[in-house]
Amino acid sequence: MTNIRKSHPLIKIVNESFIDLPTPSNISAWWNFGSLLGVCLILQILTGLFLAMYYTSDTSTAFSSVTHICRDVNYGWIIRYMHANGASMFFICLFMHVGRGMYYGSYTFMETWNIGILLLLTVMATAFMGYVLPWGQMSFWGATVITNLLSAIPYIGTNLVEWIWGGFSVDKATLTRFFAFHFILPFIISALAAVHLLFLHETGSNNPSGISSDSDKIPFHPYYTIKDILGLLIMLMMLMMLVLFSPDLLGDPDNYTPANPLNTPPHIKPEWYFLFAYAILRSIPNKLGGVLALVLSIMILAIAPLLHTSNQRGMMFRPLSQCLFWLLVADLLTLTWIGGQPVEHPFIAIGQLASILYFSIILILMPVFGTIENQLLKW
């Protein structure tokens, strides 16, 4: 009799994805982030579900309902802060995961990579809409500023913005629809994640060396299940330290003031995980140009496979490209810092330089360095 996990139609899928999956024997901790993202998604859906039981998506009661959750609902405060800071952990894992893909050349799995970009965009959209829901000052003005960017689209821009708002300003209709989208999108993300895995398992995982690992594979369970659980425990420990010791560390104090359309906060800025893109947007004086740069800062990932000139897949044996990669990381951290600063003298120039450097590294320097390394290897 065959084992039920190998014969049952449903259990067989789980078995082939998480138990008997042939996995390269040399993948490092950088390959942990996929499973961590899955855990983050489940955590966000569960905490979000409990928050949705008490939240009201009406402009007159939204702010009060969030206060009510924190003050009066049993353990409401911990659910709310786990959800808010869980989003930060989600993005930390996302950035690490994408960075790993860039470093080790995982973008050569085209289908997996493109679905990953789609996932990144969907998660960003979900997080943005979630930030609007508490209906604090930064929620309201963030929604106003970011949705207003669409008005830069020629001809249809203004109509598009009013269509998204459901009126002539961010109001009750906007909040209600954002709540509806914020509720449904995580389930769409789950479906996309399943497709992401489906395509990944067609090719098998990449590994740090970038060389085919067909000759040296081990079963996913118990080796990588244990390794993933270690990563999970570290992440949960970091999350709970954030939630229990400094839950408002990554938030904006302005969001504890109820939304007021008549009073603009001095510095409108999004959550920390969007600051790099926000800095790129602000560094271009033209509205349409800024919006295009904002979109390109993420969509540039889609052409990563076309910009790959090296004969080697990953950067493990390419010291020049490694220097460039870490320069890119430093540049993104600089952009994140600039995005949170006011628009005044030194910061404007730094932001513009960092934005130029960001696009230069990806579009020009990386392909050039790849070609140089190919030539050096011929010596």
Swiss-Prot record:
<feature type="binding site" description="axial binding residue">
    <location>
        <position position="83"/>
    </location>
    <ligand>
        <name>heme b b562</name>
    </ligand>
</feature>
<feature type="binding site" description="axial binding residue">
    <location>
        <position position="196"/>
    </location>
    <ligand>
        <name>heme b b566</name>
    </ligand>
</feature>
<keyword id="KW-0496">Mitochondrion</keyword>
<keyword id="KW-0408">Iron</keyword>
<feature type="transmembrane region" description="Helical">
    <location>
        <begin position="288"/>
        <end position="308"/>
    </location>
</feature>
<feature type="transmembrane region" description="Helical">
    <location>
        <begin position="77"/>
        <end position="98"/>
    </location>
</feature>
<comment type="function">
    <text>Component of the ubiquinol-cytochrome c reductase complex (complex III or cytochrome b-c1 complex) that is part of the mitochondrial respiratory chain. The b-c1 complex mediates electron transfer from ubiquinol to cytochrome c. Contributes to the generation of a proton gradient across the mitochondrial membrane that is then used for ATP synthesis.</text>
</comment>
<keyword id="KW-1133">Transmembrane helix</keyword>
<dbReference type="InterPro" id="IPR027387">
    <property type="entry name" value="Cytb/b6-like_sf"/>
</dbReference>
<dbReference type="GO" id="GO:0008121">
    <property type="term" value="F:ubiquinol-cytochrome-c reductase activity"/>
</dbReference>
<dbReference type="InterPro" id="IPR036150">
    <property type="entry name" value="Cyt_b/b6_C_sf"/>
</dbReference>
<dbReference type="GO" id="GO:0046872">
    <property type="term" value="F:metal ion binding"/>
</dbReference>
<feature type="binding site">
    <location>
        <position position="201"/>
    </location>
    <ligand>
        <name>a ubiquinone</name>
    </ligand>
</feature>
<keyword id="KW-0472">Membrane</keyword>
<keyword id="KW-0479">Metal-binding</keyword>
<protein>
    <recommendedName>
        <fullName>Cytochrome b</fullName>
    </recommendedName>
</protein>
<comment type="similarity">
    <text>Belongs to the cytochrome b family.</text>
</comment>
<dbReference type="GO" id="GO:0005743">
    <property type="term" value="C:mitochondrial inner membrane"/>
</dbReference>
<keyword id="KW-0830">Ubiquinone</keyword>
<dbReference type="InterPro" id="IPR005798">
    <property type="entry name" value="Cyt_b/b6_C"/>
</dbReference>
<dbReference type="GO" id="GO:0045275">
    <property type="term" value="C:respiratory chain complex III"/>
</dbReference>
<keyword id="KW-0812">Transmembrane</keyword>
<keyword id="KW-0679">Respiratory chain</keyword>
<comment type="subunit">
    <text>The cytochrome bc1 complex contains 11 subunits: 3 respiratory subunits (MT-CYB, CYC1 and UQCRFS1), 2 core proteins (UQCRC1 and UQCRC2) and 6 low-molecular weight proteins (UQCRH/QCR6, UQCRB/QCR7, UQCRQ/QCR8, UQCR10/QCR9, UQCR11/QCR10 and a cleavage product of UQCRFS1). This cytochrome bc1 complex then forms a dimer.</text>
</comment>
<dbReference type="InterPro" id="IPR048260">
    <property type="entry name" value="Cytochrome_b_C_euk/bac"/>
</dbReference>
<keyword id="KW-0249">Electron transport</keyword>
<feature type="transmembrane region" description="Helical">
    <location>
        <begin position="178"/>
        <end position="198"/>
    </location>
</feature>
<feature type="binding site" description="axial binding residue">
    <location>
        <position position="97"/>
    </location>
    <ligand>
        <name>heme b b566</name>
    </ligand>
</feature>
<keyword id="KW-0349">Heme</keyword>
<dbReference type="GO" id="GO:0006122">
    <property type="term" value="P:mitochondrial electron transport, ubiquinol to cytochrome c"/>
</dbReference>
<dbReference type="Pfam" id="PF00033">
    <property type="entry name" value="Cytochrome_B"/>
</dbReference>
<feature type="binding site" description="axial binding residue">
    <location>
        <position position="182"/>
    </location>
    <ligand>
        <name>heme b b562</name>
    </ligand>
</feature>
<dbReference type="InterPro" id="IPR048259">
    <property type="entry name" value="Cytochrome_b_N_euk/bac"/>
</dbReference>
<feature type="transmembrane region" description="Helical">
    <location>
        <begin position="113"/>
        <end position="133"/>
    </location>
</feature>
<feature type="transmembrane region" description="Helical">
    <location>
        <begin position="226"/>
        <end position="246"/>
    </location>
</feature>
<feature type="transmembrane region" description="Helical">
    <location>
        <begin position="320"/>
        <end position="340"/>
    </location>
</feature>
<feature type="transmembrane region" description="Helical">
    <location>
        <begin position="33"/>
        <end position="53"/>
    </location>
</feature>
<keyword id="KW-0813">Transport</keyword>
<dbReference type="Pfam" id="PF00032">
    <property type="entry name" value="Cytochrom_B_C"/>
</dbReference>
<dbReference type="InterPro" id="IPR030689">
    <property type="entry name" value="Cytochrome_b"/>
</dbReference>
<feature type="transmembrane region" description="Helical">
    <location>
        <begin position="347"/>
        <end position="367"/>
    </location>
</feature>
<keyword id="KW-0999">Mitochondrion inner membrane</keyword>
